Structure formats: C-alpha cells, structure tokens
C-alpha cells in the first residue's frame, strides 16, 4: 500500500517557535508509519524554509528535528517547493505567522490540504480582543476588560482601566499565545510597565480583570459536525500559568477529567462548541475557561493550534475520550482533506 505524505512545518517566526519544535517532534514519533511518509520543513525566524528530515519509519527516541543549530542552509528552498500532490500539511506552528491565518492562506494558494482552522477563524481567534468582541456578541461570558492600541494616550487608558477594573489586572499582547508577554499587575506602576512589555510583542494590548478561578480546558474536533471533550484542569503551583511554568519549569499538572459538577461540564462543552462555530472553526481547537468559586464560567480564549506534544492538554483530553494520539493525527488528516475538498468545490 502506498503511503500518504504528511508534511510537518515547524519552527516559525514567532516567540513560540520552541514550543512548535516540541510539538512537531511528538507528532513525528506518534505517526502511523504504515500509512504515512513524513517530510519536515523548518521555518527560520527570518521566514526561510529549510528542508530537513524525512521519515518512512518511526525515528529513535534520540532523534531530534533539525533547528537553528543543526539546519543546513544549502537545503533552503522556495516556500512553494513544499508542494506535493496528494500530501497533507500539518502546520505545527504557534503564534503570529503560524496560527493567525498567514500560513493557512499560503497553503490555500498552493492548493494543499492542511490540518487546522481556516484563514478567517485562525486570524480572529489569534487576536484576543477580536475574539472577545465576537464571543460577547453571542452571549458567551467574558471577564471585564479594556484595550490599549499603540499610539493612543496611555495615561487616559490607565484612568479608564482603573475606573473599570480592580487589581490584580492581567495584561496580554492581543496576538500571542503560550502566555508569552503576559504580566500580572498589582499597582498602577506595574500596570504601565506591563502594557509597555506587551507592546514589545504586539501593537494591540488586552487589559483584563484578574479573577480567582480554576483554569479548565475543553478540546474540540470536527468540521461541520464538531465534537467536544470532557474538560481537563490545569493545576497550578505558581501564581499564574506563564510560559516559564508551562514549558521550562514544569510547575503544572493536569487533572483529566476535571473534577467539576455535571452542569458545569455541560455548560462549558456547549459554550466551546458554540464559540468554535461562531468563529468558523474547523479541524481542531482548545477552549480555555475560567471557573470561579461561585460557579461563574468565563471563556478566556480559543486556541486554534494548541500545544501538541504527547504531554499537552489537547491530545490528553482526547485520549481520555478514547481517541489515542496516533488516531487523533489520522482523524485530523481526514478532516483536513474534507475541508480542502469543500473549499475546492466552492471555486466555480
């Protein structure tokens, strides 16, 4: 039986490129090599496409994907050279230029099926401010927030924020993930510094009311028909779940399924599915919620390319539902092909 080519794109231009490499290495080990041939391409911080390894069988545990230190610049290619008829692309890319619609649009121009959400839903979900406004419009609860856009009057923004929110306040770049650039402010001075830090990552800044809450996550899978998982919980040993805690210090554990009332489970799964459809989602996403002590549910964000390592929440949520990691990858390939066929059928 001939194998289908699965193209892995990893690395990328955003500050989340290290997470991308971890996710891609997990995928390359989990793929069913009876069915797939895996070709990998590293995208440098400057946006260069480098042809890296090819796998026809499961690599050894010591095998690592090539990155900045090990790539061969002689293998630099034109981005369009990744094209291969019949191949499916898994853009295991996080953050700007990865899950913001940019690479998705490129792959649509190439006429290649790809795993994940489309251009529109990727770009909307990547921007935390736009996501909040869309979800508010359909009645999904959001924590109170204000917005600062680079070039506006910062002092006026501080006055407005302190009139509407109380400390602690969280400040986030609108277009970053993996908690990159997020700060917790307890004073006006810290708030100003937090906004200035966020501006180094994005020109749009979300300023959000801090809440004492559990962090609960729901996985989503599907195209026109979407399925959701039972929720899982992020158990924190730190003040908040930042990049260092997530990927460097390993100061988090997960409870899957989360220990929450059935009514809350039903509410979260419903909100997650409605949000996914409202943003035009397809393929996969992970919805992140806050659950307060009094039972209030807030949808914090919708992540269209969640961390995909074997220890990441998203694959583990589906494993808890009976869908093993290799089978999850196969299902995503099938969904990618379905969406490709649907897009092509509309081009008449």
UniProtKB/Swiss-Prot annotation:
Pathway assigned to this chain's UniProt record: Cell wall biogenesis; peptidoglycan biosynthesis
Residues annotated to bind Mg(2+) 1: 288, 301
GO biological process: cell wall organization; peptidoglycan biosynthetic process; regulation of cell shape
Keywords: ATP-binding, Cell shape, Cell wall biogenesis/degradation, Cytoplasm, Ligase, Magnesium, Manganese, Metal-binding, Nucleotide-binding, Peptidoglycan synthesis
GO molecular function: ATP binding; D-alanine-D-alanine ligase activity; metal ion binding
E.C. numbers: 6.3.2.4
Cofactors (names): Mg(2+); Mn(2+)
Spans through the membrane: none
Catalytic activity of the protein: 2 D-alanine + ATP = D-alanyl-D-alanine + ADP + phosphate + H(+)
Residues of the ATP-grasp domain: 132-334
NCBIfam families documented for this protein: D_ala_D_alaTIGR, PRK01966.1-4, PRK01966.1-5
Protein name in the entry: D-alanine--D-alanine ligase
